[in-house]
Structures are given as C-alpha cells and as structure tokens.
Curated annotation (Swiss-Prot):
Family as reported in the entry's similarity comment: Belongs to the cytochrome P450 family.
Source species: Saponaria officinalis (Common soapwort)
Sorted UniProt keywords: Coiled coil, Glycoprotein, Heme, Iron, Membrane, Metal-binding, Monooxygenase, Oxidoreductase, Signal-anchor, Transmembrane, Transmembrane helix
The protein's name in its UniProt record: Echinocystic acid 23-monooxygenase
Pfam families assigned to the protein according to its UniProt record, in alphabetical order: p450
Gene this protein is translated from: CYP72A984
Enzyme superclass (EC): oxidoreductase
InterPro entries per UniProt: Cyt_P450, Cyt_P450_CS, Cyt_P450_E_grp-I, Cyt_P450_sf, Cytochrome_P450_Monooxygen
Applied value in biotechnology: Soapwort saponins possess anticancer properties and are also being explored as enhancers for endosomal escape in targeted tumor therapies. They may also serve as precursors for vaccine adjuvants.
TM region(s), chain numbering: 4-24
Source lineage: Eukaryota, Viridiplantae, Streptophyta, Embryophyta, Tracheophyta
C-alpha cells in the first residue's frame, strides 16, 4: 500500500508529460512543419510566432486603422482600413501568401480562378470548425458538411423558390413602407433633414425577416431579432478571448449575460416551433412564411425518405431552432449592408441616382413597387446593386480548411491542417478581369449582363459560389430592389456634411460611424 502514492504520482507525471508533448506538437512542431511545406512551394509570409502567430500584430494594426475614418471625398479602396495586416502581406509578398491564425497557417487566395475552384470543391475545402462563441450566433446550414448539409439544403431550397418569394412580397412591403413613412415625417415639406439611415436599415431588414420567417407571430420574431442583436454584440466583444481553452465556461459577467440571452432566444423559438407543430398535427395547413415552409418541407421529405411511413424527421427540433437563428443573422445583416452602401454610393454619384429614379418612375409611377416580375425588369437598379455588391460585398472574405489528405489548388499543393482565406473582395476587383478602373463605381459594367461584365470569367462572388452559394440571395435582392425603388420614389438624397467614410466589420462590412444622409421630399 505504501507504493500507491508513488504509482499515482508516476501516472500523473506521465499524463502531464503526454499533455505537454501534445501541446508542443500542436503549438510548435506542427506549425514549423507546415511552414516548411508552404515555403517549399514559393509561398511567403512571416515566420511563425509561438501560440499567437500573426494575431497580435494583426489586431494592433486593425485597431490603429479603425481609429480614424478615410479622407473625404472618399474612394472605394478601403481594404487597408478593414484588414491592414493582410493588405501589407499582399503588397509585400504578392497574391497567395500566408498568415498565422494562431498556430494554423492560412493561405490568402485572391485570384478569381482559385477562389472559384475552392468554392466548387466543397468536400475538400470545408468550413472551419465553429468555435463555441460563434456557434451561439448561428450554426445551421452554413456550418454543416457532407450528408447533413445536403439534406438540410434540399429541405430549405423550396422556401426560397420564386413562387414562395412572391408570397413574401407583402412582408417586404409592410416593413419598407413603415420605415419610409418614418423618414417622410422627419423631412419638412420644402426643406431637408439629416437621417442616419444605418439604424433604420438594420431595423427594416430585421423587421422583414421577422415577418417573413414567422408571419402571424411577428411580435415573437421581433423579440428574437432584438435578442440576437444583443447576443451578436456580446459574442464580438468576447471573440478576443476565444483562443483560451474553456473560456466560455468561466463565470464572467459577459459569459453569464450571454448564456441568459441565449436561453431566452432558445425558449422563444421553442415556443413558436412547438405551437406550429401542434397546429400541423391538428390538421392545419402550413403557413406561407419561412418557418411554415421549412416545417412542411421537413415533414414531406421525411415521409418520402421513409417510404410513406411515420419516420423520424430529417430535421430535429434543435435543427429547426438553429436554422431560424441563421435566417435572422444572414437574412437581416447582409441586406442591410447592401442597402446602406447603395444609398451612400448613390449620394456620391447623383447621375446614377437620377437614372435609377427615372427607371423606377417609368416602371411604377408612384404606385408601390410590389410586382415581383416588374422589380426584376429594373435593369438600372439591378446594375447598381451588382456594382455595390462588387465593391462592398457584405462579407469580404470566407475561410475554408483542408482537414483530410494533401490536395492541389491550382499549382499549390495544400497539406491537411492548413486554412485558406478566400479574399472575394480582391477577386471582385481583379484588374485583369475588371480593368484598371476596377475600384471605381461604374454600374454600366453590368449593362450587358454578368457574363459580359466579367469577360466570361467567374470573378463575382458577393454571395459565394458553387454548391454552397448563398441560398437567400434572391430574397436579399428582391427586398433590396423594392426598398431602393420606394426610397427613390419618395426622396432625393445626398451625403450629410457630418458623414465620414469608415467601412469596418468583423463579420459584415458596416459603416463604423453610421450613415447620416440629407433627405428632401420629391
């Protein structure tokens, strides 16, 4: 018995030693091995720094850049502001260099053909594993791989078909009219008024997704949207700690608040979905909102898969909750970003504002622009939206990671464990495709369609590409066309003297100091 303490101590020492060796493998030996493999291929980047890699320097440079707005009058070369570290890497080493995300190297890919290839090869270049903080915001379709992704995509697709989008036009209309009427009340009959449109547009798109997702229980949807906005701010404030193992489980004030907000979101969504489930089981028809369409698709597909017999549903109760959260995050944020930069650029380019208004008035007069087919015939408005998406994509880069086996991407041989950042913003401005004026606002590039604009190349990635292209892009574009048309019918607008150009954002490309514009009634 007297040997037991020595045995226990020996076992503890072995466990600690094994843990230490594993940590050294992860934090030192493996990064150095990967660095050698990347440099052998001519890829360049900074030498690996223990644990943090390039993250400290990247964060410092970004904070410095975001501390001041861009000079006025502004141009569209804002990448050095939102990601100065990567901008310096690209200038120093050229396209296809690498940086260190902690102990993981990430190759920066900006050449359009390589971006397209990586998007298309979704089974090899997968989404990185979601950290616990980000998972609180949204998992669902965007985070799934393989068979689960395919099944969920198949179930969600019908909700975004054209005939279903047409059913959501009243939800779009109601929310847009509400905001435009609020603006009109602020503008005197024969004068002008300054309105910061950014809060209004985020509220508008949140309102739209609340109505489109939950229909008759819109009030619950609105409350969920408000809580998700709070949760997003909490997550962003805590992301800097996400590299610390187990940090989210510590009893900090931020973690406690985040848990409470998440529990309330979960409770509200459970109630809404449970009530819908009971109604469907009682024989009521599925609602024509996103949740109703999704639940109906889930039931029908599950029955088909089960040969018509009562079978376990493909999408679980929690899966439905996760997809609803994703509807909110993706559905409101990306559209608000598209709308705000569209209005800002139309302020700067008054000639295009005039052309777009003339087209809207020729198509709708002063009638509400609620005809889906007529909205899609707005050629100039569509050209403008495409050019805004090219210059100010809602998401400027997308991360992927190779988990299994060595593979080639173009001439690069990428070993497993290496990340890649697909710099869609760089591909959208490649001078070889778009010309030397690639950073200038020129909607007429799209006058003869996308294929002509890109000279037959695939070099336009505002919604991603390939099998995982954004499922809600037509939803966002229809909502945006209607909102822009209605605003052009009611107002002329210009930049306020207080406007400062400051694109920023960790997730989407937001105006850091808002978007104060001067409005006049027409």
């Amino acid at each position: 018995m007297e040997y037991l303490p020595y045995i226990a101590t020996s076992i503890a020492c072995i466990v600690i030693l094994r843990w230490a060796l594993n940590m050294m493998q992860w934090l030192w030996f493996e990064p150095r091995r990967l660095e050698k493999l990347l440099r052998k291929q001519g890829l360049q980047g900074n030498s690996y720094k223990f644990l943090f890699g390039d993250m400290k320097e990247s964060s410092m440079l970004r904070n410095e850049a975001l501390a001041k707005p861009m000079p006025m009058p502004f141009d569209n070369d804002y990448f050095p502001r939102i990601n100065p570290f990567v901008d310096q890497l690209l200038n120093k080493y050229g396209m296809n260099c690498f940086l260190w995300m902690g102990p993981v190297p990430a190759i920066q890919i900006g050449e359009p053909e390589l971006v397209r290839e990586a998007f298309n090869r979704m089974h090899e270049f997968q989404k990185p594993k979601t950290n616990p903080l980000s998972a609180l915001l949204a998992t669902g379709l965007v985070s799934y791989e393989g068979d689960k992704w395919a099944k969920h995509r198949r179930l969600i697709n019908p909700s975004f078909h054209v005939e279903k989008l047409k059913l959501m036009i009243p939800a779009f209309r109601e929310s847009i009219v509400e905001v435009v009427n609020q603006w009109e009340k602020k503008v005197p009959e024969n004068g002008s008024a300054e309105i910061d449109v950014w809060p209004s547009l985020t509220s508008l798109t949140g309102d739209v997704i609340s109505r489109a997702a939950f229909g008759s229980v819109y009030g619950d949807g609105r409350r969920i949207f408000e809580l998700l906005a709070v949760q997003k701010e909490l997550v962003l404030s805590l992301l800097k700690f996400s590299y610390i193992p187990g940090y989210t489980y510590l009893p900090t004030e931020g973690n406690k608040k985040m848990k409470a907000v998440n529990n309330e979101i979960q409770r509200l969504l459970e109630n809404v979905i449970q009530n819908r489930k009971k109604a469907m089981e009682a024989g009521e028809a599925a609602k024509d909102d996103l949740l109703g369409l999704l639940m109906d698709s889930n039931y029908k597909e599950s029955m088909l898969e089960g040969g018509g017999k009562n079978k376990k549903l493909i999408m679980s109760f929690q899966d439905l909750i996760d997809e609803c959260k994703l509807f909110f995050l993706a559905g409101h944020e990306t559209t608000a970003v598209l709308l705000v930069w569209t209005l800002i650029l139309l302020c700067k380019h008054q000639d295009w504002q005039t052309k777009a208004r003339e087209e809207v008035l020729a198509t709708f007069g002063m009638s509400e622009p609620t005809d889906y087919d007529a909205l899609n015939r707005l050629k100039i408005v569509t050209m403008i939206l495409n050019e805004v998406l090219r210059l100010y994509p809602p998401v400027v880069s997308t991360n992927r990671k190779l988990f299994k086996g060595e593979t080639k991407l173009g001439n690069l041989v990428i070993p497993p464990g290496v990340g890649i950042s697909l710099l869609t913003i760089q591909a959208n401005r490649d001078p070889k495709v778009w010309g030397e004026d690639a950073s200038e606002f020129r909607p007429d590039r799209f006058a003869e369609g996308l294929v002509k604009a890109t000279k037959g190349n695939v070099a336009f990635f505002p919604f991603g590409w390939g099998p995982r292209i954004c499922i809600g892009q037509n939803f966002a574009l229809t909502e945006s066309k209607m909102a822009v048309a209605m605003i052009l019918q009611r107002f002329t607008f210009d930049l306020s003297p207080s406007y400062t150009h400051a694109p920023s954002g960790l997730i989407t490309l937001n105006p850091q100091y808002g978007a104060p514009l001067m409005f006049r009634r027409r």
